[in-house]
C-alpha cells in the first residue's frame, strides 16, 4: 500500500517511536499473510526499542519469507537486509505456565539505528494450522493505546467462501470489491488516535475498535468441529482401563463416590503441562497417553475425565469457555472466542461442572467449586448455542487476631492469629501450602510481622488444619510481642494502633469521572476481626456501620464486653466490576471506609489509669496470609488472562 502523510503529534508518543504504517494482507486463496511496517523513531529511547526485529511463526505448518529491511535517513534508503544475521529462536513465552507451543521467532539485531530514522520491513507467512480444516476466523484491531499513522488491512477470498463480519466500538466497515472469482475486503485508515488507557478494568472490557471475521455460520458448526477432534475414548485399555476397573470394584453402586474419585485422579494425579504443537493447540491427546504420562493441559485433562466417566456409565461432555468472561454470546461463532476447556457431567440427575486443571479441590461428592466462567460451548453434535455456567458464590476468608495485653507497656503481648478458608479460598490455600515447605511458610509469616513488631517471636509452629471433605482449611499462628506499645514520654502515655488494610487493599482507588467499569475481586468475601483483651477494661461506646450497594456490602461493628474489645469488619462483592454509573458512589464509600472506619487506636496512661479512643490514619497491620492468597490469586488470574485465544489451555 502507498504510504500516506502522517499527522502524529510526537507529544502523544510513548517509548520513543510510533507506527507510521501498519499493513496486513490476508490471502485465503494462497493461504498466506503479508505484513508491512514502518516505525518512526522520535527520541533516543526509541533507538533502543526499535533496533531489533522479532517475527513469530510455527515451523510445523508455516514458512516465513522476509522481503526487505530498510532504514530511511535524510530521505535516503539504507538496506539492512542481512539474511545470515537472522537467528531462529524458540519462542516459549508461556513455558513458565507449563505450556510448550513449539513456536519460533526469527530475530535480528540491527546496527547503526539513530533518532529520526524510519525502520521499514515486510514479510510473508505461508500456511495455517491444519486443525481448522481451512476454515478462517480472526480478529483485527484498528486501534491501540498509541497513535498510528496509517492502517491498512485486507482479506482476499474466493467468492465461494462466505465470510461473516462484525464491528465493535464503532470500528469501520470494509470496502468490498469482487473481481472474477475473488472478493477483496479492504480497510484503509489515515491517522488513528490511541485509545485511553483503561487500567483496573475487568478482563472482559475491550474499548478498542476491532472487527471480527468468521467463516463459521453458527455455534453448532463450532461445537461439531470441536467434538470431531476431541471424541471421548469410551473403552480405555492398558493402565487406564485397569485403574477404571479397580475403581468400579471399590465403589460398586456408589455412583457419586465413583464420580468424585475419578475427578480427584484427573485433578491431582495428572499434573498440568501442555505440549501444544501444531494441531494440538485445540486437539487433545489420547486419554490413555495422558494418563500414562501423567501430564496434560486443560483439553487433555478434560477429555481424560470425560472418557473415564463415560466408561463407568456417567454421561459427560467436554466444554470450552473463556477465562476472561468475555460476552461470548455477542461475538460471531468462532473457536477463537475460547481459551480453556472444562467438563460438564450429569451425576444422578444433577449437572456438575468441573475444571480438571484445579488441583486440591475439597468438598464431597458432587459438591465441587467451579469458577465463574460466564458462558460455555458444549462440544456435542446436539449443541446449538452457548449456555450459561453456574454463578456460584465463592468461599470466604475469616481472619481473627487475638491480642492479650498485660495492662502496661512493660509486659509482653501475646498474639494468636486464626485464619479459616472455605470453598475455593480453601482450594487456593491448599495448593499454596502444598507448594511450600513448612519452614518457608513459617518464615514468611514471621518475617512479615517482624516488620511491624521488630521484637516479635514465634512461640509455636504454624498449625494447619485441613478438612478436605468439608472444604475448609485453618491456620493458627502464635507470637509474643515485646514492643507492642508506642510510648509518649511527654505525658507518660503509651498507645497501640490497628488498621484493617486487608479490607482497603481489596477496594481499588478511582476517581468520580471514570467512564469504564473497575475490576474488583469476585467472588470475594472476607471477615476480619480484632480482639484485644486488657485488664484495664474499656470505656469505648459501641459503633456500627453498614453500606449496602448492588455491587458490594461493607460492615463495621465495634463493641466491648468486660475486658474484651471486638472490632468486626466484613466486605463482600456481588459481581466482578463497579459499573460506570456506580463509580461516583463507590468512590465516596471508599473514602469514608478507608479514612474513617478501618483504623483504631487506644491509649493507656501510667499516671491516671486507662483511657481509650478511636482514631484514624495510624499504621498498617497487614495480614500475611491474606497477602499470600492475594498474590496467589493474582498469579493465576494473570496466567489465565494472558492466554492466546488461538489455543485452548
Regions of interest found by a model, annotated:
Residues 632-640:
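Cytosolic-side junction of a single-pass transmembrane alpha-helix
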Residues 641-649:
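Cytoplasmic C-terminal tails of single-pass
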Residues 1-633:
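A sensor for short, sequence-defined functional sites
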Amino acid at each position: 500500500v502507498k504510504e500516506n502523510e502522517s499527522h502524529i503529534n510526537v507529544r502523544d508518543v510513548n517509548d520513543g517511536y510510533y507506527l507510521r504504517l501498519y499493513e496486513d494482507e490476508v490471502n485465503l486463496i494462497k493461504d498466506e499473510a503479508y505484513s508491512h511496517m514502518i516505525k518512526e523513531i522520535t527520541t533516543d529511547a526509541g533507538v533502543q526499542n526499535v533496533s531489533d526485529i522479532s517475527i513469530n511463526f510455527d515451523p510445523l505448518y508455516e514458512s516465513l519469507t522476509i522481503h526487505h529491511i530498510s532504514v530511511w535517513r535524510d530521505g535516503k534508503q539504507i538496506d539492512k537486509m542481512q539474511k545470515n544475521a537472522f537467528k531462529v529462536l524458540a519462542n516459549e513465552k508461556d513455558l513458565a505456565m507449563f505450556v510448550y507451543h513449539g513456536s519460533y521467532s526469527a530475530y535480528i539485531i540491527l546496527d547503526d539505528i539513530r533518532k529520526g530514522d524510519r525502520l521499514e520491513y515486510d514479510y510473508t507467512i505461508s500456511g495455517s494450522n491444519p486443525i481448522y480444516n481451512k476454515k478462517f476466523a480472526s480478529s483485527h484491531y484498528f486501534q491501540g493505546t498509541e497513535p498510528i499513522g496509517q492502517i491498512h488491512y485486507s482479506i482476499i477470498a474466493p467468492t465461494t467462501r462466505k465470510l461473516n463480519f462484525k464491528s465493535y466500538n464503532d470500528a469501520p466497515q470494509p470496502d468490498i470489491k469482487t473481481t472474477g472469482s475473488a472478493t477483496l475486503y479492504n480497510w484503509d485508515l489515515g491517522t488513528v488516535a490511541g485509545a485511553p488507557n483503561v487500567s483496573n478494568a475487568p478482563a472482559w472490557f475491550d474499548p478498542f475498535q476491532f472487527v471480527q471475521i468468521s467463516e463459521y455460520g453458527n455455534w453448532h458448526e463450532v461445537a461439531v468441529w470441536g467434538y470431531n477432534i476431541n471424541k471421548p475414548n469410551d473403552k480405555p485399555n492398558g493402565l487406564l482401563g485397569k485403574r477404571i476397573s479397580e475403581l468400579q470394584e471399590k465403589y460398586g453402586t456408589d455412583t457419586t463416590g465413583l464420580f468424585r474419585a475419578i475427578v480427584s485422579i484427573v485433578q491431582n494425579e495428572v499434573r498440568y503441562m501442555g505440549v501444544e504443537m501444531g494441531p494440538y493447540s485445540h486437539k487433545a491427546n489420547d486419554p490413555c497417553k495422558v494418563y500414562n504420562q501423567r501430564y496434560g493441559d486443560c483439553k487433555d485433562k478434560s477429555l481424560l475425565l470425560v472418557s473415564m466417566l463415560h466408561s463407568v456409565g456417567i454421561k459427560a461432555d467436554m466444554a470450552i469457555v473463556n477465562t476472561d468472561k468475555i460476552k461470548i454470546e455477542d461475538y460471531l461463532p468462532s473457536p477463537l472466542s475460547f481459551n480453556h476447556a472444562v467438563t460438564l457431567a450429569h451425576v444422578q440427575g444433577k449437572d456438575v461442572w468441573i475444571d480438571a486443571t484445579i488441583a486440591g479441590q475439597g468438598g464431597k461428592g458432587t459438591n465441587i467449586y467451579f469458577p465463574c466462567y460466564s458462558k460455555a460451548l458444549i462440544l456435542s453434535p446436539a449443541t446449538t448455542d452457548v449456555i450459561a455456567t453456574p454463578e456460584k458464590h465463592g468461599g470466604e476468608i475469616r481472619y481473627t487476631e487475638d491480642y492479650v495485653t498485660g495492662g502496661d507497656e512493660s509486659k509482653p503481648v501475646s498474639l494468636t492469629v486464626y485464619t479459616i478458608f472455605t470453598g475455593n479460598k480453601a482450594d487456593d490455600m491448599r495448593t499454596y501450602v502444598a507448594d511450600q515447605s513448612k519452614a518457608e511458610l513459617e518464615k514468611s509469616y514471621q518475617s512479615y510481622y517482624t516488620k511491624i513488631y521488630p521484637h516479635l517471636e514465634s512461640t509455636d509452629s504454624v498449625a494447619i488444619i485441613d478438612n478436605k471433605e468439608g472444604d475448609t482449611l485453618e491456620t493458627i499462628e502464635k507470637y509474643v510481642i515485646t514492643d507492642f506499645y508506642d510510648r509518649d514520654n511527654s505525658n507518660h502515655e503509651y498507645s497501640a494502633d490497628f488498621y484493617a488494610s486487608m479490607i482497603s487493599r481489596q477496594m481499588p482507588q478511582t476517581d468520580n469521572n471514570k467512564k469504564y467499569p473497575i475490576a474488583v475481586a469476585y467472588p470475594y468475601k472476607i471477615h476480619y476481626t480484632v480482639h484485644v483483651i486488657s485488664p484495664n477494661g474499656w470505656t469505648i461506646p459501641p459503633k456500627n456501620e453498614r453500606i449496602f450497594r448492588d455491587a458490594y456490602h461493607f460492615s463495621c461493628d465495634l463493641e466491648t464486653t468486660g475486658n474484651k474489645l471486638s472490632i468486626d469488619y466484613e466486605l463482600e462483592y456481588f459481581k466482578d466490576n463497579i459499573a460506570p454509573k456506580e463509580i461516583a458512589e463507590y468512590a465516596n464509600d471508599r473514602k469514608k471506609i478507608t479514612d474513617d472506619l478501618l483504623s483504631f487506636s487506644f491509649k493507656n496512661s501510667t499516671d491516671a489509669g486507662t483511657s481509650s479512643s478511636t482514631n484514624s490514619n495510624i499504621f498498617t497491620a497487614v495480614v500475611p496470609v491474606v497477602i499470600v492468597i492475594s498474590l496467589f490469586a493474582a498469579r493465576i488470574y494473570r496466567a489465565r488472562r494472558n492466554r492466546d485465544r488461538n489455543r485452548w489451555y
